[in-house]
């Protein structure tokens, strides 16, 4: 790895890298053939756990009144692939990633996942270099402002309910129309949303989408997710 690139990464992360070989590995995709130093997959595995721990710690400190459910939703939003990929782009990491020829034209979700994997691998290298105390400033630098700005209580209710349901046990909300009434030009839909292990709720609206959103909002409020988020966002 060229010295200017290492210098740039050290400025971006605020960390002096002791193990340059691991740093190179963190930026190498498995599609690179004959790579002696290996690829980032094992580092990504470790970095994912370190990121989750430090984000959980940060949220616990930032939102002392938040319920476990709210913290889980916020955690999921901050460690998901899209957020990590956004940070990779902010750091201009994509130009530093080594990939095989067949991966040069990667697009969409697979590209997002690769960027996220590299961020997590980079976190692992910092952790192996200096432990949690070395990683914490990096996490605070790129994630803390996102955590503070996140108005989770006002995000799309269906998306938030899906995230909340996932952290409850990997389940998904199921929506079904239970009734449709009114004329074609002014219909009224009643939609039931159910989640395994929880009581269902029914929402009403002039479209299926609106009724689904209303039903999702009812569960979020009933379970205390929106209530605590709204309280925290006004403090």
UniProtKB/Swiss-Prot annotation:
<dbReference type="Pfam" id="PF00035">
    <property type="entry name" value="dsrm"/>
</dbReference>
<keyword id="KW-0540">Nuclease</keyword>
<dbReference type="GO" id="GO:0005737">
    <property type="term" value="C:cytoplasm"/>
</dbReference>
<keyword id="KW-0963">Cytoplasm</keyword>
<feature type="binding site">
    <location>
        <position position="117"/>
    </location>
    <ligand>
        <name>Mg(2+)</name>
    </ligand>
</feature>
<dbReference type="InterPro" id="IPR011907">
    <property type="entry name" value="RNase_III"/>
</dbReference>
<comment type="subunit">
    <text>Homodimer.</text>
</comment>
<keyword id="KW-0460">Magnesium</keyword>
<dbReference type="InterPro" id="IPR036389">
    <property type="entry name" value="RNase_III_sf"/>
</dbReference>
<feature type="domain" description="DRBM">
    <location>
        <begin position="156"/>
        <end position="225"/>
    </location>
</feature>
<dbReference type="GO" id="GO:0008033">
    <property type="term" value="P:tRNA processing"/>
</dbReference>
<keyword id="KW-0694">RNA-binding</keyword>
<keyword id="KW-0698">rRNA processing</keyword>
<feature type="binding site">
    <location>
        <position position="44"/>
    </location>
    <ligand>
        <name>Mg(2+)</name>
    </ligand>
</feature>
<dbReference type="Pfam" id="PF14622">
    <property type="entry name" value="Ribonucleas_3_3"/>
</dbReference>
<comment type="similarity">
    <text>Belongs to the ribonuclease III family.</text>
</comment>
<dbReference type="GO" id="GO:0019843">
    <property type="term" value="F:rRNA binding"/>
</dbReference>
<comment type="function">
    <text>Digests double-stranded RNA. Involved in the processing of primary rRNA transcript to yield the immediate precursors to the large and small rRNAs (23S and 16S). Processes some mRNAs, and tRNAs when they are encoded in the rRNA operon. Processes pre-crRNA and tracrRNA of type II CRISPR loci if present in the organism.</text>
</comment>
<keyword id="KW-0819">tRNA processing</keyword>
<keyword id="KW-0507">mRNA processing</keyword>
<dbReference type="InterPro" id="IPR000999">
    <property type="entry name" value="RNase_III_dom"/>
</dbReference>
<protein>
    <recommendedName>
        <fullName>Ribonuclease 3</fullName>
        <ecNumber>3.1.26.3</ecNumber>
    </recommendedName>
</protein>
<keyword id="KW-0699">rRNA-binding</keyword>
<keyword id="KW-0479">Metal-binding</keyword>
<feature type="domain" description="RNase III">
    <location>
        <begin position="6"/>
        <end position="131"/>
    </location>
</feature>
<dbReference type="GO" id="GO:0010468">
    <property type="term" value="P:regulation of gene expression"/>
</dbReference>
<keyword id="KW-0378">Hydrolase</keyword>
<dbReference type="InterPro" id="IPR014720">
    <property type="entry name" value="dsRBD_dom"/>
</dbReference>
<dbReference type="GO" id="GO:0004525">
    <property type="term" value="F:ribonuclease III activity"/>
</dbReference>
<feature type="active site">
    <location>
        <position position="120"/>
    </location>
</feature>
<keyword id="KW-0255">Endonuclease</keyword>
<dbReference type="GO" id="GO:0046872">
    <property type="term" value="F:metal ion binding"/>
</dbReference>
<dbReference type="GO" id="GO:0006364">
    <property type="term" value="P:rRNA processing"/>
</dbReference>
<dbReference type="GO" id="GO:0003725">
    <property type="term" value="F:double-stranded RNA binding"/>
</dbReference>
<dbReference type="GO" id="GO:0006397">
    <property type="term" value="P:mRNA processing"/>
</dbReference>
<feature type="binding site">
    <location>
        <position position="120"/>
    </location>
    <ligand>
        <name>Mg(2+)</name>
    </ligand>
</feature>
<feature type="active site">
    <location>
        <position position="48"/>
    </location>
</feature>
């Amino acid at each position: 790895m060229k010295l200017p690139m290492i210098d740039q990464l050290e400025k971006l992360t605020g960390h002096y890298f002791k193990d340059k070989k691991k740093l190179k590995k963190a930026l190498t995709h498995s599609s690179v053939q004959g790579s002696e130093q290996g690829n980032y997959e094992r580092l990504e595995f470790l970095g994912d756990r370190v990121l989750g721990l430090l984000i959980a710690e940060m949220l616990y400190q930032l939102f002392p009144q938040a319920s476990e459910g709210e913290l889980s939703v916020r955690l999921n939003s901050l460690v998901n692939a899209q957020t990590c990929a956004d940070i990779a782009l902010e750091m201009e990491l994509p130009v530093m990633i080594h990939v095989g020829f067949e991966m040069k034209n990667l697009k969409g979700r697979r590209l997002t996942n690769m960027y996220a994997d590299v961020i997590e691998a980079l976190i692992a290298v910092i952790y192996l270099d200096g432990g949690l105390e070395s990683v914490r400033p990096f996490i605070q630098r790129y994630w803390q402002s996102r955590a503070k700005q996140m108005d989770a209580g006002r995000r799309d209710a269906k998306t938030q309910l899906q995230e909340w349901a996932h952290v409850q046990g990997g389940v998904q909300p199921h929506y079904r129309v239970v009734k449709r009434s009114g004329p074609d030009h002014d219909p009224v839909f009643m939609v039931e949303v159910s989640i395994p292990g929880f009581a269902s709720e029914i929402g009403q609206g002039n479209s299926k989408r609106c009724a689904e959103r209303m039903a999702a909002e009812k569960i979020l409020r009933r379970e205390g997710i929106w209530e605590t988020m709204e309280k925290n966002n006004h403090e």
